[in-house]
Amino acid sequence: MKYDSNGALLATSIPGLPEPHRGKVRDIYDLGDSLLFVATDRISAFDCVMPNGIPDKGKVLTQMSLFWFELLSWMPNHLLCWDAAQFPASLKAVAGDLAGRSLIVKKARTIPLECIVRGYLIGSGWKDYRKNGRVCGIPLPAGYQQAQKLEEPLFTPSTKADSGHDENIS
């Protein structure tokens, strides 16, 4: 495991397993019939991974996911196990590092989609608006200021890129 000077987990390495697929924030290990998702403390903003992390950010992301899995428990999903104490024996040596930030999930076909709901005109939305008065192809009234609250939330899905830029879907 690789931690920064503030104790943020930046990268994982699990003895006996091949190197993971590394996304911008998560490391994904192939366990055969399932996958291990590890939410690191890496920070990704504007399609860039920052050199330092935020300690326990991965734990917060995982707890948010578990909240939604519980709220929508009536709907079938891919979650198999979230409790590191119940993970396979091959993961016991790193159970302390994985606790609270890891999920074992069913393998499934990935749909590379990011669902974004925008409440404020900031970031790439502001950049688009300044250029053409639209956000992801959605026209907005003139006169908005940077970081201003939008009258109604905007749903602006994009493709999900492992590296490089996500592309807006219009």
Task: For each feature predicted by the language model, list its residue ranges.
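Active-site loop/lid in soluble adenylation, ligation, and acyl-transfer enzymes
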Residues: 2-161
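A structural motif
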Residues: 158-170
